[in-house]
Amino acid sequence: MGTMPKDMMDFWFGDTVNKGGLDARTRLLLTLAGLTMQGAQNDMALRQTVRHAREAGATKQHIVETISQMSVFAGLPAMTRALELAQSVLDEEKDTKKEDGA
């Protein structure tokens, strides 16, 4: 599954609505934290959020730290599930780069 076009990302997660506010990467990491807090129950939403966060400049470390921080509040099962889903996206990303010859 792909990601939304850049102009939509900028509108929904950038500073189009709130000039001088949070950048897209931060908004998406907060969204990822919220999805983890809900128990990482919505696989598709969590995976899409990881993809969008990566496109917005989040590193693997940003994603792992965001999810791990939520273990304090959401518990280890939610953190583990979210990390598994995030890792599957990162693995797909790695496989795509191999296929593209990068």
Q: What is each PLM-predicted segment?
A:
Residues 1-28, 37, 55, 79-102:
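Acidic, glycine/proline-rich low-complexity segments that act as flexible tails and inter-domain linkers
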Residues 9, 29, 45-46, 63:
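N-terminal alpha-helical segment
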Residues 14-17, 34, 50-54, 64-68:
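Amphipathic alpha-helical segments within well-ordered protein domains
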Residues 23-29, 60-65:
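Alpha-helical scaffolds flanking conserved acidic
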Residues 28-38, 68-69:
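Contiguous, well-ordered alpha-helical segments that form the cores/surfaces of helical PPI scaffolds
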Residues 34-42, 58, 74-75:
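Short alpha-helix boundary/capping elements
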Residues 42-61, 81-89:
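Extended intrinsically disordered, low-complexity coil regions enriched in Ser, Thr, Gly, Ala
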Residues 69, 76-77:
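Substrate/cofactor-recognition hotspot
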